[in-house]
Structures are given as structure tokens and as C-alpha cells.
Amino acid sequence: MDITGRKLFVKALEEEGVDTIFGYPGGTVTDLFDELYKTDSINLILPRHEQGLIHEAEGYAKSTGRVGVCLVTSGPGATNIITGLADAHYDSIPLVCFTGQVPLGLIGNDAFQEVDIVGMTRSITKYGVTVRRREDLGKIIKMAFYIAQTGKPGPVLIDIPKDIQTASGPAEYPSHVDIRGYKPIHGVHIGQLKKAYKMLKSAKKPLILAGGGVNISHAGEKLKKFMEKENVPVVTTIMGKGAVPTTHPLYIGNCGMHGKYAANMAVMECDLLFSIGTRFNDRITGDLNEFAPHAQIVHIDVDTASISRNVVVDVPVVADAGVALEKLLEWAEKKDTAKWQEQIHRWEKENSLAMRRDRGISPQMIMEHINAQFPHSIYVTDVGQHQMWATQYLELDEQSQLITSGGLGTMGFGFPASIGAKIANPKKPVVCITGDGGFQMNIQEMATAVTQGTGITICLLNNNYLGMVRQMQELFYGKRYSATCLRRRPSCPGGCKGPNDQCPEYVPDFVKLAESYGAYGIRVEKEEDIDAAFAEAKKHTDAPTIIEFMIATDELVLPMVKSGNPMSEMILK
């Protein structure tokens, strides 16, 4: 049966079970949008900018475990999703992104809105291709969905020239494809895993390090059972937070640059680091020569390229976290770690996350109230100080989830990602935790949130600064606050120490801004008003509510380890 490329495109999405697509139209994809108009099975979301669009798809994918799907036009439409592709690449988020392209005969002629988007994104996609023959379209789309969600998940880009969309001929959407050279890991090498487990049994001070791979493979329950059976304490990376309940007695906390004192000390003093689903990012290791100096290291990861790339390990195991843990559970036996846990409890008495209550609203207070008022929720953060406070203080269990930008650290990620998460989970509370800097990077998505009727609670921590950079300037750059004050004007004196009486009070006024979009806005300056603001936000299920928390400009995220230093060198006060 003859079928056009545009019809095959929509049929492919339906066959893959796609129920939502985030798309922004343009000249080279008008045919595809016209075909989407005719189907009732796919919800087409119109964002206000392509970067917002791809972050919304990330939020959708992270909150569901399904593939996020994007559709944008050629040229600037395509280049605007590059940051999101990189973000998804580093955080292993399954996306299939379709870009329009000029007709085949114009490729290479510098045609209007022609860019080589496949070439531009080759290093940040699992697979990228320009469709050259209409009869290949179905096979390529099938490959894209398979590649995006198998092995180490990630983004795939399919570039579809305009004439491929309109060409007609015989074609079917395949039920499966064989991809030469692509062999994702499904099993586990039992011999290597037994070596790793034998090492665990002989250790006196074992420690499990759980990364984002545990969450990606939905292996949190298996990890919880394993650590309980073995009686071994656990630390997590930021991306691994939530893999086990944060209130569990064997859970110590996040480790790394802004990790908990006890968690970092446990890494530094353990004699076996049993790592699962982490790539040993520099924010976790600090000085590689001083990382886990007394430990033998086991590394279980589905990505062969991650093994021994940053940290040379003693026992490598290439496997999905869930598959490895399932086998480990068959062997698990309780071991005596009482003395080791006593040492950890002594470190925990340092109370490196102590809360300040001596000067207005502290960020820690806000997180405490979020825990009380929004349990069992999806928490989405942007990037900056607020992100670290959230990862330090939010309590997570099996019914809650933390979504954040870890590998790329993308400011502007949080708000659109929360929209995508809410669209995917309309009945679940979604709390966006953001700052006055990051929120303004994709503030136009307020229109998307309002038109989609997403009742998101936006906790905006406003310190009038790019707070994380300001913190580095305070601690390491002699308090020279260069280009970090968000209220600074040309008339401000050189060497300005921060907002003063001559500065405009609000830039912008987030309450009025919310109202101008048809959303809700509340400003909170006292702790006693926090719960009332949350109660008001819960009433608004038809549109987002911005709760602007006015916090001190000089709040610091502590502990902190200077980049490149050993994780034992924590700044605590």
C-alpha cells in the first residue's frame, strides 16, 4: 500500500505508543504538523521556545521512564534544541527528536534555514541521521526508539527533509529491526559479579555508592533489599538520590562537592566502594589522586565506556544496575558492620546540614516546609544554590522523585521540565524549585504552563543574585562580585557589594509577572507565612503558582569542596 512520509511518521508514533509530542512548527515541518492535526491519539504540546520544548520532553521522559518526543523545524528551530540534547546526553534521558530539513536537492547549498544539525550534534546524541530515502523512514524511526531507550538511554535525532515527508510509495512500519553494531548489554558476567561480591563479603568497612543508573533502571527497591540483607550503608550521587528512602537508617546522604560531611568521610575512609550506576563525575570525586584512598573499587555500570574512564577500578562489571542487583540478591547474606556504622554515626554528629533560624527565611526552612506540605511529590529543580539545598534537604521515598540537571548543569532546565512532568502526571503534585536567575532563562514557558492548565507550585528562591557564582566569588575571589547581581544598573558604583537603596526593588516583580500570564503569584518574607502560601497554591489546579521566597543575598550552600580539592577538605562554616 502506498503511503506518504508524513502519514508514515504519524503511524510510527502511534505504533510506538507515543501519547504526547512537544513541537514547534515551521516551514520544513508544516506537513508533519498538518498530519498530527488529524490524529486524536497524540497530544501535541506547543511551547514558546524550542529550548523550553526539549526540557519539557526531558521532564516527561524522566517522570515516566518513557521516551520523550520532540518536533522542530530546521535551522534555528533545530539549533535551539542543542542544549537540551546535551543535557539529555549527560543525564541519560531517552529522547527522540525530529527536525525538519530543506529538500534533498537543496542540502549543501546554504538554503534558507539549512544547517547540518546531525553533524553539529554527533557528539551529544546516541544516533543521528538525515533520512535520504522515503522507504527508509519507518526503519529509521523504529531504530531511533529502540536505541534511545536501550543500554545507556540517551537522545536520538532524526532529520527529515521536506520532500521525504510528502513523497509517496509502498512502505510498512516494521515490528522490529536488527541494528548491525549496536548490541546493548542485557545480561551480566557472572564471574565478574562473583568477584565483586566476594570482595564485598571480605570488606570491613564497605560502602555502596548508588548513582543515577539505579534510578534509570528502576532498581531502587532491589538496592534497598540488598543493602538491608547485607547491612551495608549507602551514599548517593545527586542523580542517585531517591534510589533508597532518604530516611532509611542505612542511608547516609549525598556525597560530593556539596555532599553531607558523613557521606564524604565514609567515601574517604571505606575499604570497599561498591559503586552501582555512576560514572564518577568530578563533582563526586574531587582530586582523583585522593578519592577513596583506602578502598578497593567495584564499578557496575551498563556503559562500557564509563568503566575506569575517570577512576581506575579493581573489579569492573558491565551490567544494568537492576540486572546486577537481582543476581546479587540471590547471594546476599547479612554481615557485621556495627563498628563501621558506629564510626559513620560519629561523623553524622557533625550535623553539617544544620539549619539556621536566626535571620528571616532560610533556604533550609523552605525545604523543610516542602517536605511537610508536599510529600510523595515530583520535585524538579533548576541549577544553582537552590538545587543543592533541594538535594541536601528534600526527603524522598518510593512515591516521590527528584528531577534535576546533573551532568550538564543547565540553568533554565527546571521550570520547563516541571511542565513536562506535570503533563505526564496530571494527578501527582509537581513542585518546581528554582532561583531568580535560572527561572528567567525560560520564563516564556509560563504561557505554556498556563495554556496547558498545569497546576505546578513554583518555589522561587530570590536572592537577587546568581547565587552559586556569587558564593564562589565570596569564598575564592576576594568578594569581587563581577556580573552576579541581578539588580545592578549602570549607575551602580564600581566594586558594588550588592543591592542597595538605589536599586529597583523587584527586577522583575515575579508576582505581577505571574498574574500577567494568568497564573498566580505570592511573595513570602516570613517563615510563619510559608504554610499559608503552600495552602493557597494547592487550591490552584488550573494554572501554576509562583511563590517568591525572599532570602538573604549572602546565603551559602555548605558543605562545599573547592573544585579539584580532595573531598575531605570540606568548608563547613
Name each region found by the language model.
Residues 6-9, 14, 19, 32-36, ...:
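Active-site diphosphate/adenylate-binding microenvironment
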Residues 29, 50-55, 386-388, 526-530:
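Short acidic loop-to-helix transition motifs that present clustered carboxylates
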Residues 107, 112-113, 308-310, 316-318, ...:
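Thiamine diphosphate
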Residues 2, 50, 109-110, 183-197, ...:
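A general structural motif
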Residues 153-156, 334-347, 546:
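Flexible, glycine/charged-enriched surface loops at secondary-structure junctions
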Residues 159, 380-382, 548:
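Short beta-strand segments
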Residues 124-127, 178-179, 345-359, 495-496:
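Short glycine/proline- and acidic residue-enriched helix-loop micro-motifs
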Residues 1-332, 369, 378, 455-458, ...:
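N-terminal alpha/beta PP-like core and its mobile active-site loop of ThDP/TPP-dependent enzymes
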